[in-house]
Amino acid sequence: MAKKINPIKFSEDESAHDSIIEWWYFNGNLRDEEGNRYSFMNCLFKADVKKVKIPFLSRAPFKNIYFFHSILSDIKKKKFYPVVDYISVVSRDSFKKPLLFINHTSPILVKGYLNRSLEETEKFSYRLKDDNLDLKMVSTKRPLLEGGEGHIEVCGRGSHYYSLTNLKTEGEIKIGNKIIKVTGKSWMDHQWADVSYSKDKWSWFSIQLDSGVELMCCEYSDGKSKSYLSDIVYSDGRQESLKGLELIPGKNIWESKKTKTKYPLAWEIKLKEKKISLKVSALIKNQEIIFGSINYWEGPLEVAGVIDGRKVVGAGFMELVGYNSDYGNIDYIKNELERVAGYFLASPKRRLRRMFKRLR
């Protein structure tokens, strides 16, 4: 008998769920007052420690663990500033308000106490704060229920999934000691599922066209089969799940010096049914995130192409996960694993009590 799929309800389902894995993800393309370009990614993960089966997290002394990844990129200077926290401490009042509210920090105080937060100030309006940004975002369209109903199936695995595809954004970013005012457009994903970690591979794209059209495209592979997903939001807000997606990697390949992973940084996206043909290319080559034994590429795109005979341009984001890695630096892996272990072996209870006091 097929498992009943509960429809997504707002605002209840913006909060946390009793699932194996869950994340609240944002990306965006921004400009300052001089027209200089920047991008960001911000993602807080929640995982059931025993069931998610991520190797280096399995010994953590909690039921659920939170961890945090973010990137701020300076497009002109071709530099990116990643932050990876293997564990985040969430405050007691998180998920306790009528609208989404998460307050968290790192238990490792390298640069002093720093508070990070995601707060829904009004329905589908958010304030996002982390190490390098303080942004206000307002959704101009209703949530995109991915897959048509907010539930997707990839290679036999089910997941609840919705997106806010057009978030009008303004605020500040911080590079070094410099505070920069910015405006732009952001994208939000919220996904939760009862699936364990696996070495599956996926190539994911969020596209925001200047014409007001947004597009999500994904190819997912478990090594035996592939699943393709594509959803579109039209300029008038209509939504549609599309079939026949083709994702064709180009010849622009970047090889990581750390992991030896080869990432294709240019792609062609085709949906013949809707006469969509888009070419996307990365704005910065090195956007690799390393999380223990897991590495992935995440970064901004420029987009150009044709929809139904009309030329279109825009911006986007790409995520490449599960691409073959051939670590050549054993010492680097050893240091990473030792750093992860340090989170849990150095008086974890005393350290966590101190963090909870700060977050009360």
Model regions and ranges:
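Structured soluble/peripheral alpha/beta segments that form catalytic or ligand/cofactor-binding pockets
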Residues: 1-360
